[in-house]
Amino acid sequence: MITTERLILRPFTENDAADLFEYLHEPMVHCFFDMKISSMDEAKEDAVKRMENDCYFAIELKDTGKVIGEIFVHPDGEGMEEEDSEGGYSDDTYSPCWILNKDYHGKGYAYEAANAVFDYLFNEKGARRLYAYTEDYNIASQKLCEKLGMRQEGLFMEFISFVNDENGDPIYENTYQYAILKKEWDKCDK
C-alpha cells in the first residue's frame, strides 16, 4: 500500500466492483475500450481479477474510501527477462498506465497517484526506466507525462487500433511514447 496526502494506492478488493463499474462502463479513451464493463457481474469478476494481480493499484480517496481509478504497472519484457548472475530474473523497466473516473479529472489525483507510484517503482522496485504510451488526442495524459518529468521519445503513426469504423475496418491511432530514467527522476522537482 502507498499513501499520499489525499490517496491510498492499494490492491483491489471485491468491494471495489461498483466504483470499477463507474469508471469502466464508458471509457473515454479508446485504449481502454477492451476493458469496458457492461454489468455489475462483470465488474465483480474484474475486481477479483485485479485482486489476483499485484500490477494493479486501486486509487482510493482517503477521506471517502471511494475508488476513483487505477494505475496498472506492467513489467516490460515479462517472460523475456535475461537471467541474472544468481540464475533468477531481473527487470528494471516498467510501463505504467492510468485511468480515472471522469468525475475526478482535473483535480490533480492522477498526478498525485502516478508520482507516488513512480517513486515506489524507482526507489522500492529498483526500476531504471519507466515509459508510457498516450494517444495523440489525449492532451491531458500528455501533460501529465510531462509534469511527471517524462520526455517524449517518439510519435508512432497509425500505431494501433482499438475501434473499427462503420465498415468494420480498423481506425488506427497515432501514439506518443514518453519515458523517464531513474537518474532523471532523481533530478526532478517533485
How would you name each of these model-derived features?
Residues 1-31, 60-190:
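Acyl-donor (CoA/ACP) binding surface of acyl/acetyltransferases
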